[in-house]
Amino acid sequence: MAALNTAFGSEGIKNLGGEAVTVNDTTVDAGDLNILNNYTSGLVTASNVTTITGTLADVNASYAASATSGNAIAGLGDESVELTDTRVLATDLVTLNTDSSGTSGTIDASTISVIEGTAATLNTVYDGKVSAGSNGFTGL
């Protein structure tokens, strides 16, 4: 991933920007994945990715860019996620843990010390807590 972003960001390499790109890394930083997606108008295929790390905003942005064609990120949906935030909104956690807009994998939220939101949304977050396995939060 780093080499791809370096190549696209280099002033010495010309005429890049419309290519389809395949990410071979199994662990990626969501911010880096979003940067790569912004560098090209082609499809970024991330089907080899098994773990995504980063802030909740960056991770949700990666999943929001999910599509199978055009300027999008393809192949996401069942990755493990390791969040790096200490403070988040409950609604953003719910978005990430929704199969249609986030991951069905395990979400490591162990760095989070403050979750803000309504009682109903907080209940939804804690209802998504799992002790092991996938499709839920760990570390809460």
List each model region and its residues.
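General marker for long, soluble alpha-helical cores
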Residues: 1-140
